[in-house]
């Protein structure tokens, strides 16, 4: 996580600057001459986390797809025990193996990490 750094002499914000001679990253005050070496070369990190890709491909007639496995997990919305499931398609470091269940009764999408009763797969 990137944080703001402040000058220990004048309390102004420090800005990143490259030391081209020694090829290192410094944080430097624009008001006084204070500078400190950065512990990491990371200045800014922008992570986009989206949930839209996880359920990509879910269509109205997903229940008629014979290639999808079926389970008897109870739907939290309509309590039906007829659903199909698939694994998350996201490929992020923080993504664990999450199964997405699609209820064939009400088309509700729910995940395997929600607390529920025992599931059997067929």
UniProtKB/Swiss-Prot annotation:
Superkingdom of this protein's organism: Eukaryota
Zn finger (C4-type) location: 7-32
SMART domains cross-referenced by the UniProt entry: RPOL9, ZnF_C2C2
Record: residues binding Zn(2+) 2: 75, 78, 103, 106
Entry's localization field: Nucleus, Nucleolus
GO terms for cellular component: nucleolus; RNA polymerase II, core complex
UniProt main location, coarse: nucleus
GO molecular function list: DNA-directed RNA polymerase activity; nucleic acid binding; RNA-directed RNA polymerase activity; zinc ion binding
CDD domains in UniProt: Zn-ribbon_RPB9
Keywords of the record: DNA-directed RNA polymerase, Metal-binding, Nucleus, Transcription, Zinc, Zinc-finger
Pfam families to which the protein is assigned, alphabetical: Zn_ribbon_RPB9, Zn_ribbon_TFIIS
UniProt: Zn(2+) 1 binding residues: 7, 10, 29, 32
UniProt zinc finger (TFIIS-type) residues: 71-111
GO terms of biological process kind: maintenance of transcriptional fidelity during transcription elongation by RNA polymerase II; transcription initiation at RNA polymerase II promoter; transcription-coupled nucleotide-excision repair
Described purpose of this protein according to its UniProt entry: DNA-dependent RNA polymerase catalyzes the transcription of DNA into RNA using the four ribonucleoside triphosphates as substrates. Component of RNA polymerase II which synthesizes mRNA precursors and many functional non-coding RNAs. Pol II is the central component of the basal RNA polymerase II transcription machinery. It is composed of mobile elements that move relative to each other. RPB9 is part of the upper jaw surrounding the central large cleft and thought to grab the incoming DNA template. Involved in the regulation of transcription elongation.
Subunit-structure text: Component of the RNA polymerase II (Pol II) complex consisting of 12 subunits.
Family statement drawn from the similarity comment of this UniProt entry: Belongs to the archaeal RpoM/eukaryotic RPA12/RPB9/RPC11 RNA polymerase family.
Entry-linked PANTHER family: DNA-DIRECTED RNA POLYMERASE, DNA-DIRECTED RNA POLYMERASE II SUBUNIT RPB9
Protein name per the record: DNA-directed RNA polymerase II subunit RPB9
Underlying gene: RPB9
